[in-house]
Every structure is written in C-alpha cells, then in structure tokens.
Amino acid sequence: MKKIFVKPRELVVPGTLLAQGPFKNGRGTFREGNAIYSTVIGLVEIRGNVIRVIPLEGPYIPEVGDNVLGKIVDVKFSSWTVDIGAPYQASLRVQDAVEERIDLLKTDLRKIFDIGDIIYAKVKAFNEVNQIDLTTKGMPFKGGPLRGGQLVTITPSKVPRLIGKGGSMINMIKTLTGTRIIVGQNGWVWVSGKNDELERLAIEAILKVDRESHTQGLTDRVKEFLLSRLRELKEQGVIEEIPEVNGEEGGEDDGQA
C-alpha cells in the first residue's frame, strides 16, 4: 500500500506519520517498517519519491541534489572549501568545477574561485561522516563567481514560500524590482539590481516573506508593499515606469528562480 498522509509545506511534529509504502525517507524523518515518520518540528517537502521535513529552526542540513549558494573560505591544492551555512563546511573539487583537465602544478585555483567569491552549486554527496561535496557543473552562470549584488540569508524552511507556487512569489519580486535573484535551498539569496534603491527594495520584500511566511494573504501584501514603494520611487524620479506582470501592475508570473 502506497499512501501519503500529509501535504507539502504542512507543519508536522516529531512522530507524525508522513507516508506508507515504497517512499525514500530524507532528512528529518525515520522509517519504521513500512511507515515514515517525522523526527523534527518542521515543514514537509515531497520531491518525487523522497519525503523529508525541513526544520523550522536550526542550521541548514544538506540533502543530495540541493542547489545552494556558498562562499569560498579557503583555496587548497586541488579543491576549495565552501561555507554553505551548514554545521560543516563543504568541499568543491577541481574536477567538479571545470570541464577541462588542468595541470594543478601550473594552475592557480584562485583565478577560478578565490576566497570571498560567491558560487552557485549543487550538493553532490553528503555522507555519514558529514563530508559535503559540491559541484558547479551544469549550474546556471557556470556556478559563478557571482559578481556584485548582495547576499541575504533567510530561514531555510522559508525557501519554498519565497519561491512560491510555480515560482510566483520570487518572479513577482524579480519582475517588479527588475533584479536578478538566485535562491539557494540553504536559505542564502543573491540579489543584484539595476540600482541601489531597487536592489534594497527586493531585499526588503525577501525579508518580509521570511518574517511573515506563516501568515495568510502574504502574496497580496508583498505585492502591495512593492507597488507602494515603486510609486514613491517613480515620484522621486528614481524609476520612469512601474513594471507590469501578466498585463497588470503587480500580477503574478510563473517560473522558477
């Protein structure tokens, strides 16, 4: 028998029965016989055949396949050490960052990624000894480094709310502010705007989602917040027009950040 007893983004407590059947239990869950239960207070996430629970509080716990933003904190002979906001630092090996073979004796890895650089990577492996391996191969922007912009952190469990159904929330913020935004599943968000005011406005909207993610009508409130601030910026001459989404001010758009 295959059955799921909870909905995506449902708040659960330890011991909650999540599913029965041939599902794979991810982080924040445990299996007992044919059943999968929650081990933490958090929000349910269902990806294909994998069920996990994202804790409401605490540091980011990696899951293989997660797309994350990270900061280079050390450059070694054949790899980089990366901070992704997890309890343990991650590692990015040369072969997981570049397509071509390189001579490590003749190559300064700092010319690829240097300390302080922000990268966009995928969690390739996470084992029982807490070794986290990343890869930037196949990632947008070739994994980075991401130039300019600002890095904002939100609670990892709030990431699905920031993205919204079908990407609706994050795309509304991106369209109305004209900013480039990359959301990592570790709760790190990179924001790059056309000017400081629009970049700051996008960040304020992101932090508003983080603070109010548990409330009803959040999309409408964020939309009205953005439109109100954009009208002020237009009056001040900072912007010429207020962008349209789906043909009207502040409408929703679909897509993934």
UniProtKB/Swiss-Prot annotation:
Keywords: Cytoplasm, Exosome, RNA-binding. The keyword Transferase does not apply. CDD domains: KH-I_Rrp4_prokar, S1_Rrp4. One of its GO terms (molecular function) is RNA binding. Residues 65-137 form the S1 motif domain. The gene is rrp4. This is Exosome complex component Rrp4. InterPro entries: Exosome_RNA_bind1/RRP40/RRP4, KH_dom, KH_dom_type_1, KH_dom_type_1_sf, NA-bd_OB-fold, Rrp4, RRP4_N, RRP4_S1. SMART domains: KH (SM00322), S1 (SM00316). GO terms for cellular component: cytoplasm; exosome (RNase complex). Gene3D superfamilies: 2.40.50.100, K Homology domain, type 1, Nucleic acid-binding proteins. Belongs to the RRP4 family. One of its GO terms (biological process) is RNA catabolic process. It is found in: Cytoplasm. Non-catalytic component of the exosome, which is a complex involved in RNA degradation. Increases the RNA binding and the efficiency of RNA degradation. Confers strong poly(A) specificity to the exosome. Residues 147-206 form the KH domain. Transmembrane segments: none annotated. Its main location: cytoplasm. Component of the archaeal exosome complex. Forms a trimer of Rrp4 and/or Csl4 subunits. The trimer associates with a hexameric ring-like arrangement composed of 3 Rrp41-Rrp42 heterodimers.
